């Protein structure tokens, strides 16, 4: 019986081992597939689901393709809502806090490379919107997500904003971020997990 276990374990190790060349090839293949579906995520191709787009922007960032694809970031500026946020669907004006923080986060990171003044103004406008929407107990809300999940995304955005904008000493942002962290901490269960009745991260 022990022999079979060793054989299976060795087979599993062989199956899960992948070298850098294979991994790079796999990543390139996946990116090529995404590129072939550009009409389904790029604002250059029309109206889009901003949740899908922000995930693709993360891929662009991770693959170091930002200098080659600046317009994918710049197009987000054009669909920002007047309040400083973004909607789930680019062609609507119902701002989603969850989407706003993730799009804002990608623009913060992308603009470290692009250094575009319009993107910078957009990110700054996003910050003002986010700060204005914090509730008294420290949370942020989004009708499609729990307060816990939304507040996690906002505190992440605020942290990235402070680091990328050299604003770690900004007391206004620090106060909001820490208040958000305190809200998150209060939701932790005795088991160590975070859980609420709306969504289970």
Which residues are covered by each model-predicted region?
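Serine-hydrolase catalytic machinery in alpha/beta-hydrolase-like enzymes
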Residues: 85
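An alpha-helical repeat/solenoid feature that recognizes helix-turn-helix modules
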Residues: 1-21, 43-71, 88-125, 136-178, ...
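Buried hydrophobic core positions in alpha-solenoid tandem helical repeats
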Residues: 30, 34, 76-77, 130, ...
């Amino acid at each position: 019986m022990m022999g079979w276990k060793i054989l299976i374990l060795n087979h599993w190790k062989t199956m899960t081992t992948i070298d850098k060349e294979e991994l790079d090839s796999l990543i390139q293949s996946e990116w090529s597939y995404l590129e072939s579906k550009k009409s389904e995520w790029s604002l250059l191709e029309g109206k889009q689901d901003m949740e899908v787009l922000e995930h693709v922007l993360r891929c662009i960032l991770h693959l170091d393709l930002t200098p080659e694809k600046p317009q994918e970031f710049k197009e987000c500026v054009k669909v920002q809502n007047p309040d400083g946020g973004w909607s789930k669907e680019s062609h609507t004006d119902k701002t989603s806090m969850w989407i706003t923080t993730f799009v804002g986060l990608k623009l913060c990171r992308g603009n470290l490379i692009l250094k575009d003044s319009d993107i910078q103004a957009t990110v700054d406008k996003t910050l003002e919107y986010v700060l204005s929407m914090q509730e008294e107990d420290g949370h942020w809300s989004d009708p499609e997500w729990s307060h816990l999940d939304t507040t996690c995304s906002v505190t992440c955005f605020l942290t990235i904003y402070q680091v990328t904008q050299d604003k770690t000493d900004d007391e206004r942002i620090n106060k909001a971020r820490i208040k958000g962290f305190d809200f998150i901490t209060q939701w932790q269960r005795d088991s160590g997990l975070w859980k609420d009745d709306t969504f289970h991260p």
